[in-house]
Amino acid sequence: MPMKLEGSCQCGSVEFALESSTPVPYQLCACSICRKVGGYSGSVNLGGIADSLKIKKGKDLIKKYSAVMARGTPDEKICASERNFCSNCSTMLWLWDHHWPELIHPFASAIDTELPVPDEMVCLMESSKPAWVRWPEGKKQVYDVYPEDSLEDWHKKHNLFFE
């Protein structure tokens, strides 16, 4: 059975709930987009079941942002994904992409439910990380870009997939 996740923004104006089969916060992304919108070291995204999302409070305060990839280069383009955030306090809530409409990716930082603790972290986008950003201490795997395993693949390999 999927795990029920409850989340909110920092100011408390937005509250939401959803179900997740992939709730372990093991993957830290340090790409420039995640660092700019998520803070110093980047963001940790979870996997969620999109049609289970219930906005309990503050729907009118949720705004969307589509990030700019390769900003300032000839390859610059707008991402297809939408980052949903609270327009009062700027808390990043979840990411959704029309290429995978059945999925939603809540930011672990917005989740109030106690999450399972990973035995190790997967740190990705080393190639985008400035030298002054430090990976967390402890057991970890570091990738220059995205690893081959999806969130679902990783959870299943580690017997942490919530069916």
Where are the language model's segments positioned?
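A short Gly-Trp-Pro
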Residues: M1-E6, S13-E163
